[in-house]
Amino acid sequence: MKTQKQQYVTIKGTKNGLTLQLNDDCSFDDLLSGLRELLLLEQYTDGREGHKVNVHIKLGFRYLTEDQEMRLTEAVSENEHLVIHSIESDVMSTEEAKRLKAEAEITSVAKIVRSGQVLYVEGDLLLIGDVNPGGTIRAGGNIFVLGALKGVAHAGCNGNKQAVIAASRMIPTQLRIAQVFNRAPDQKEDGNEMECAYLDIDGNMIIERLQQLAHIRPNLTRLEGGM
């Protein structure tokens, strides 16, 4: 019976270059050998002299060490017409898993953030206390202040546009969500109504009564039972 040769690499041409889908079941050495063999069969040029074709590599559920990634890059670079544009894996590294776990956690802090001080947490911040003018609080997730927010608050500082800022007294010098910022108005009534800030679908920062938060972010329930 004739044995069917295992396919180590599937190549697909796109308008952005070549996509290489790598087999994630075989050994790395077999994969590398199969890749080299396949790339030798064709020149894979776009017809323009001196122009290189972008290669997007999809690893599937395979994790590469730094050495393996370097060897893979060298194998593709042996074809002078190809250049690696991206390498994607469905496997999460330990460092990335730790980062995502930290961003999903709520950190509770009881203190006053005074002028010149910066308080940063990777996930959600629950601050029990005030933020004085000149003080700054930053969080990778949401910010909840049980007190007066009179300084700077930056939620979603790693780019999370779904983050919100809420405070018992919202009289900040500046609010930031992801890369969007909103300076405080020249005059603001010092009321006692709790408020929240969020980005709407157009990326504009909106400040509403805190009661609207349940409608704006209905999935925001991580604080339930945590206070």
From Swiss-Prot:
Domain of life assignment: Bacteria
Give yes or no: UniProt keyword Isomerase: no
What Pfam families does the database record attribute to this sequence?
MinC_C, MinC_N_1
- Membrane spanning residue stretches: none
Q: Which UniProt keywords apply?
A: Cell cycle, Cell division, Septation
Show which residues constitute the signal peptide: none
Q: Which GO terms describe its biological process?
A: cell morphogenesis; division septum assembly; regulation of cell septum assembly
Answer yes or no on keyword Cell cycle. Answer: yes
Q: How does it assemble?
A: Interacts with MinD and FtsZ.
Please describe what this protein does.
Cell division inhibitor that blocks the formation of polar Z ring septums. Rapidly oscillates between the poles of the cell to destabilize FtsZ filaments that have formed before they mature into polar Z rings. Prevents FtsZ polymerization.
Which HAMAP family does the protein's record reference? Answer: MinC
Report the family membership. Answer: Belongs to the MinC family.
Name of the protein in its database record: Probable septum site-determining protein MinC
Query: Which species is the source of this protein?
Result: Bacillus pumilus (strain SAFR-032)
